[in-house]
Amino acid sequence: MHARVARYGIDPDKMVDALEALRDAGREVADLEGYKGGHVLVDYDDGTLITLTLWENRAAIDRSEVRAAQLRQRALRSVDGEVQSVTCYEVPFELG
């Protein structure tokens, strides 16, 4: 399994709108081949938002890269947010 972690900077006053826009984008991401799930992490005080999406394998995460970037940009455009970083990782095991 592989994970893509994206970190965003959002105006804290626009966080609720950003979450709504990312929820909509997430529905489209979920339709991409090899998608296995995802999570959103948020710090309402400082405007940090992180998305973590899980993918079946390296090929799936690579295939999704362009579309995922388009969806991120579309979601952030509505709230003047910025993508601070996007990094992919291998997931060797699940805790627990």
Per-segment meaning from a language model:
Residues 1-49, 56-69, 76-96:
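Short S/T/G/P-rich N-terminal loop/turn motif that feeds into the first structured element of a domain
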